[in-house]
Structures are given as C-alpha cells and as structure tokens.
Curated annotation (Swiss-Prot):
Domain HTH myb-type residues, every copy: 11-63, 64-118
Organism the protein comes from: Arabidopsis thaliana (Mouse-ear cress)
Binding-site residues, ATP: G47, L48, K49, R50, C51, G52, K53, S54
Lineage: Eukaryota, Viridiplantae, Streptophyta, Embryophyta, Tracheophyta
Gene3D superfamilies: Homeodomain-like
Protein name, as recorded: Transcription factor TT2
Subcellular location: Nucleus
Length: 258
C-alpha cells in the first residue's frame, strides 16, 4: 500500500554513499539522451539503484555541463564575502552571481575556509543590521491612542465673574453697553396706580389711531421719559404736571399717521 507499481528496487537495496564512475556514466548518458524528466522515476528507468534525490543532487552539483569544480580564485572569494554581507546565508542567490559555481560548493567553501579567515564581528554584521532595522520598524509602528471625551464642563458663571473683575471699563459704561436695561430694570412700577392718579388722555389718545399697535413702536422709556427723573426714583405722591401742549401733541401724532 502506498508504493508505486513501477518501483522495482526496494529501499533496503538502494546504494548509499559515494558514487562510482560507472554510476556517473549511466546517469550522464541517460540525461543526455532523454533529458532530466521526473526525478522520482528516473532511477528505475535509467537502471540505477539510487533514490531520486541522490540522482538530482549528483547531476546538479557534479555532472551538469559547465560546472567549475574547485580552484576558487581570490576574486571569487572576495565576491562571495561581499555577497554574504548583503544576502547572508542565501547560497542559491550567491551562486547565481558566480557562473559555473553551485550553491553547495560555495557553502562548503565558506564554512571550511572563508568563515575562519574573517573576524567574528564581520561575520555577525548582517544579524546586527537586521536587529537595528527591526528596532526602527518597531519605533515607526508606535501609535498614540485617542481619548474620547464623554463629558463637557461649562464654566459660564466663572467666566462672567472673571470678565467683570478684569474689565477696564467703569461701572456706568458697562451698564450703558448692556443697553441701559440696568437703570430701569431695578425699578418696579405700579401702573394701575399711575393710571388712576395721572390722566394719560391729556398726553395722547391711542384709541383714535388707525396705525395698528403704536405702543409696539414706542418704548416704555420714551413714554415715561418725562415722568421718571434721571436718578431713577419716582415719587408717586408728587402731583403730575404736563409739559406738553395741545399743539405739540397733534404734531407728534401726525408723524405716526399711516
């Protein structure tokens, strides 16, 4: 179960260890005639008592045409050192920059010869550079967490007190800026008593006007301007004396006619 029908050589019967010249000739002749093909079936078709992985490595690293074996020059060694500082232990990439050299041969030459010549600090340089780049990346990805405000405090009373305490204007000018409402806002009038003691028909007759609501056009300060003294104190026991004449009232009412 699980074994291929075309496999005629058992695992116990496979040859292990070094390749002989006869095995090299069989493998070279078969691949030259039929091509590489599928490495798992190639040993049985070529008549070799080897596994597919062993045949592949023997061909790629030793028997393939154009391969250089041994005698690595000083220029190649210098190039291997520079590429190793840049790429690290990526032997297949380093072998691609050296025509005719295999990754297995370059790795063996590095571990057996070049690594012992170089100081330890230079051989560990790629790891240190990689560690520093990781630290820089860790610093870049740090982000601040936004804080969400759920409550808002209003200090309107405190701001008004501070504004009034730090305002350079005098008290009278501040009251004038507020529209003069503070001068009349503190006074309380008994209009029923004023109407009973003073005769407003002597001043003007609002019933005879056809212009609508005239009182909406005239403020209380204008109507009672002559009744209230400048100090804001009203003496209700003082008899009323009219300052207007009949002719002045007619001229004044004529201005409000529609």
């Amino acid at each position: 179960m699980g074994k291929r029908a075309t496999t005629s050589v058992r695992r116990e019967e496979l040859n292990r260890g070094a390749w002989t010249d006869h095995e090299d000739k069989i493998l070279r002749d078969y691949i030259t005639t039929h091509g590489e093909g599928k490495w798992s079936t190639l040993p049985n078709q070529a008549g070799l008592k080897r596994c597919g992985k062993s045949c592949r490595l023997r061909w790629k690293n030793y028997l393939r045409p154009g391969i250089k074996r041994g005698n690595i020059s000083s220029d190649e060694e210098e190039l291997i050192i520079r590429l190793h500082n840049l790429l690290g232990n990526r032997w297949s990439l380093i072998a691609g920059r050296l025509p005719g050299r295999t990754d297995n041969e370059i790795k063996n030459h590095w571990n057996s010869n070049l690594r012992k010549r170089l100081p330890k600090t230079q051989t560990k340089q790629p790891k240190r550079i990689k560690h520093s780049t990781n630290n820089e990346n860790n610093v870049c990805v740090i982000r601040t967490k936004a804080i969400r405000c759920s409550k808002t405090l209003l200090f309107s009373d405190l701001s008004l007190q501070k504004k009034s305490s730090t305002s350079p204007l005098p008290l009278k000018e501040q009251e004038m800026d507020q529209g003069g409402s503070s001068l009349m806002g503190d006074l309380e009038f008994d209009f029923d008593r004023i109407h009973s003691e003073f005769h407003f028909p002597d001043l003007m007759d609002f019933d005879g006007l056809d212009c609508g609501n005239v009182t909406s056009l005239v403020s209380s300060n204008e109507i009672l301007g002559e009744l209230v003294p400048a100090q804001g104190n009203l003496d209700l026991n003082r008899p009323f004396t009219s300052c207007h004449h009949r002719g002045d009232d007619e001229d004044w009412l004529r201005d409000f006619t529609c």
